[in-house]
Amino acid sequence: CGPCARRPSKGESRVKLVVTEKNDAAKQIAALLGATKPKADKVFNTPVYRFDVDGEEWVTIGLRGHILEPDFTPSLIYKKRGGWSGVTAEGEVVPATLPASLPVPPFKKKKPFTADGVELKGWKMEALPYLIYAPIEKLPKEKDIIRSLKNLAKKADSIVIATDFDREGELIGSDALACCREVNATAPVSRARYSAFTKPEITHAFANLVPMDDDLAAAGGSR
């Protein structure tokens, strides 16, 4: 993303955003990397820590573990020409693949069935054969933290995902990055991998940043 990265305009400060899994991790990383004592701050109601590294402004924010949670789309609709689709909580229509053995509309309007599909929210017994094939969407779990994260991401010149070094951490980081990308599509992104909160370990991790591991995140999501 180097060539396409957003460049700060004249007079605009560069900000590196570091995203950790928990508030304590954000606090410790700021203390270990900062040239001086970090400044504790809040974005809305979320604690963040601001500090300086070689003249560049950095800010760390801690999540609360998973900030998104998977769920089935709340309904399915069927059209003769296009087949089945899922309808997300936001009303977006997404592809769905259901077996041909399942009955298709028109249905009588008796819950959970509608004229052109199936309502899945109530987990009615009659809907279960359809539910297991419904598309999965990710819904906000920690809305306040997501709001704060997006506020920082808008202003970020680069983003470092510094969640835990395991598949769960990779998934949490991937979800956080998805939220950041909604407001900042071009900032370069890298991954800090570390196994202990010591100055040598954290310094080494941030001096040797790597790409995100999509396969590891997918493994976390399939659990």
Which sequence ranges carry the predicted segments?
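Intrinsically disordered, low-complexity regulatory segments
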Residues: E12-R223
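Short, Lys/Arg-enriched N-terminal segments with co-localized hydrophobic residues
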Residues: C1-R14
